[in-house]
């Protein structure tokens, strides 16, 4: 047993790298020089409500001609809703801070404890490929324009110093308790700097007499792949130690609070080779004993799954991957006391024997834990022959194993896949979606570096992230997948660029459990998906065909082929007004 414990530690070892572990940090220098001429007409600090649709440029005055001192929002009970204020100043401001009051409606109150403020901070980004058609492929940062962009929502830093001739956004999020009384609530956001009040902004919130269920009960199937190894590297802690889990808890809670449904588990060494800055290691120890039999240790896998379930992510476990990018499988060979690799591909006897041993043992373990029914053996898109051969092995190991695929549309795989996710440009037929839904199967879509928009790069329009969930509603799909929640780059708080794909492609949350404009807007879209679902169910029960027709007409705006005619920003804002009327 001691040898096995040592082996587990060995498999979890990681190269110690310097990481910025302090929760207070300096932003990267702005690669774009400030143009004094743009600031010539700004003679004093300006404060206004802005728009969550805009990433305000640090080096330019906010494009607001008349300061807006009052903001009107509408929400359901149980909803989280956000607004953005903006400060731009010709002179330096010290100790800039935002303070919120309670929101009141007669004797009813939404406590300020349910309101979070944060600075919208800046990170380096880049751009699409030069042809503008996507963002895939390895890239040299020198070949792309780099700028600072507003994305990080920093709720940790209490005050900031704002240099002269610069702009700073502030993000205000209100979590409306489910037991809140319907009505119009009012409160204030006070902006202070240098010990004095610069402005008081009024916040008006209309709470409708409708209730959104908690995120754990949302129907929307959100699958953002988690990378625990990035967290251990960044903070220089032992993977899956108590310290590691303590650091991950608030990070992964962001995912749970967004309605995350799927736990990402790596059951073999580097399922995606080395495509991320921090490679995924195996959460399962593979040991070939001296007598030729196999031993599998699930200690790390179990810890990880239990940790995520405790946060409320418990609908599905996706295990990657029997068909990795590189068909080479690592295990520890006791006879030689060394790591070895088996090079084999689906359809070969060696491949089948290798995976049969593991899957049969894994099946027993999952059943003992009570997790078998929610566990999926997960794959990325691979050649059809490889996927079909892999399915044969899975079914031979245990005919009841569930299988998921994020890839392209293959009609011949519809019945075999319990969770099927295809590209945004491909379409399931309405009949296929309904047949799968009645069978309890999940049907979703994904975006990646291929799509110029809609997307969630750090330079993408904020509304694009929200548009994604509306599109799921329009297509009658169950949800959305994006491959990376937190596969951080070297210095994620300063520079979101990576050696492959556009900036921000690899992560949506930041160290310190800082959210992003992208995640907040994606979550708002998911909330509206739930609103649409709830309203349509109600109207179908009541026979309100007119309301259903109106909602379906509204959803037609969320077509990826018509974004040049109706931008994501326009579509989202129009649709929200329609839904919030009910």
Please report, for each region that a protein language model flagged, where it lies by residue.
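Active-site clefts of carbohydrate-active enzymes
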Residues: 437-466
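Bacterial Sec-dependent N-terminal signal peptides
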Residues: 1-22
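Aromatic- and acid-rich polysaccharide-binding/catalytic face
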Residues: 401-427
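Mature N-terminal, pre-catalytic/accessory segment of carbohydrate-active enzymes
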Residues: 19-273, 372, 565-582
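Aromatic-lined carbohydrate-binding surfaces of glycoside hydrolases
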Residues: 145, 166, 174-175, 186-193, ...
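Catalytic domains of carbohydrate-active enzymes that cleave complex glycans
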Residues: 330-331, 339, 343-409, 493-582
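Substrate-binding cleft of secreted/luminal carbohydrate-active enzymes
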Residues: 461-507
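Short, glycine/acidic-rich beta->alpha junctions
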Residues: 77, 244-247, 296-300, 385-386, ...
